[in-house]
Amino acid sequence: VMTAFDLVGSGSNQRILVAAGEIRAASPDSFDEQSAGDAGAAVVISSDGDGLVPLARASVSEEFHGTWRRDSADYVQGFPGSLDAKLGYARVMPEVIGQVLKEAGAEAKDIGRAVICGPNPKLPMGLAAGLGFDVTGQLEDTLWMVAGDTGAAQPLLLLAAALEKAEPGSLLLWAVYGDGAD
């Protein structure tokens, strides 16, 4: 998505479709099998002026693989959720959100909708509350109870849901977790 914004912003492209999808094969009768959600989503980034306009962005690179699948494996594997939460999510997400808010000259209270992705439904709520967001008024639902863990499609699904509720001209925070954060 950031590359699409760059290409459209530079004038080299007028419209770019960005798509993501995931189907996670998990061990039978495992928590991963019960919580996995197959999904796909797409957004169009264009120069027509009717869509998103990025005001600020940040990236934090952190090679921590909470979930993975080897080429030779049939199913995804992952570290225990608490390990991923402490060593991955809690280290990078507050940093990237803080950088974006600072660059935009905004505070949590200024954000209309906050899309905060995460590897489980509780982490985004705890993070948002800790950073001063109104969890019931600003934070976008993670859709875990409806769609499950949609993996790579989660950021675009949540962005689409937030855009449906956002007021024109309002600020939207979009924070994505995976091998760091953006």
Regions from the PLM with identified roles:
Residues V1-S12, D32-S35, G112-D182:
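Claisen-condensing/thiolase-fold acyl-transfer catalytic domains that form or cleave C-C bonds
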Residues D6-A19, I23-A25, V43-G49, G98, ...:
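Structural alpha/beta core scaffold segments of enzyme domains
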Residues Q14-R15, E63, T67-D74, A129-G130, ...:
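Membrane-targeting and insertion segments and their boundary/processing signals
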Residues R15, G40, A85, Y89-V96, ...:
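General structural feature for long, well-ordered alpha-helical segments within catalytic domains
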Residues V18, V53-A56, I116, L139-E140:
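General beta-strand structural signal in soluble alpha/beta enzymes
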Residues R24, P28-P94, G98, Y177-D182:
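Condensing-enzyme catalytic core mediating Claisen C-C bond formation in acyl metabolism
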Residues L83, L101, M145:
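Short, flexible active-site loop motifs that bind/organize anionic cofactors or intermediates
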Residues P94-G112, L131:
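Phosphate/pyrophosphate-binding loops at sites that engage ATP/ADP/AMP, CoA/4′-phosphopantetheine
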